[in-house]
A protein has these predicted regions:
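Residues forming the Rossmann-fold NAD(P)(H) cofactor-binding site
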Residues: 77
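Non-catalytic substrate-recognition and accessory regions of acyl/acetyltransferase enzymes
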Residues: 1-71, 81-161
Length: 161
C-alpha cells in the first residue's frame, strides 16, 4: 500500500491501492476522482477526493475530518484552512456526520460546518440534515442553525432525564 508525504500530510488510497505515481497524479488533480485518506500526524486526519477545476486550482470534497490530540478547539478550522491553502480551490463537505454514532455528536458536527460555511472556510455542505450552497441567505442559515440548536437542547434534556 503506497503512501505519499506531501506538504506535511500523509496521503494514501482510502479504498484499494495506488502506486506512488498514481497518488501524486491524483493529488495534482489530474487523476481519476478517487477517495484518498490523509493524516497530519498528531493534528488531523480524514478522507477526501480532489478534482482539477476550470481555473487550474484543485477543489476538495471532504467526506470525513477528525481533529487529533487532547486540545482540539480551533484545530478543525486550522486544518481546513491548511487544506485550502494547499489546494487553492473550493472545499465542499459531503455527509460529514455519517460515521458519528450518536445524534448529539452529529448535531455538534453540523453546527461546526455551518460556522465554517458562514466564515467562507468551506464552499458547500451536503448532508442528510443540512444543505448549504453558494447563494443561501443568512436568514435561511439562521433557521437551519436554530433547528439544529433546538434539537441539541431536546437531546441534552432527554439524556439528563
Amino acid at each position: 500500500l503506497a503512501e505519499v508525504e506531501w506538504k506535511g500530510i500523509i496521503w494514501k488510497a482510502a479504498f484499494g491501492t495506488f502506486s506512488y505515481k498514481e497518488l501524486l497524479t491524483i493529488l495534482k488533480g489530474y487523476g481519476s476522482m478517487e477517495i484518498l485518506s490523509f493524516e497530519k500526524p498528531g493534528h488531523f486526519k480524514g478522507m477526501a477526493s480532489i478534482a482539477l477545476n476550470t481555473g487550474g486550482t484543485r477543489d476538495l470534497t471532504i467526506y470525513y475530518l477528525e481533529v487529533l490530540g487532547p486540545r482540539r478547539a480551533g484545530l478543525g478550522r486550522k486544518a481546513l484552512l491548511e487544506l485550502k491553502r494547499i489546494f487553492q480551490g473550493k472545499i465542499f463537505v459531503e455527509d460529514p456526520g455519517e460515521i458519528l454514532t450518536d445524534e448529539y455528536s452529529i448535531m455538534e458536527s453540523i453546527l461546526f460546518w455551518i460556522q465554517m460555511f458562514r466564515e467562507g472556510v468551506i464552499d458547500g455542505l451536503d448532508s442528510d440534515l443540512v444543505r448549504l450552497h453558494p447563494g443561501i441567505d443568512e436568514k435561511e442559515m439562521k433557521k437551519l442553525e436554530q433547528t439544529v440548536i433546538s434539537r441539541m437542547k431536546v437531546l441534552r434534556h432527554e439524556k439528563s432525564s
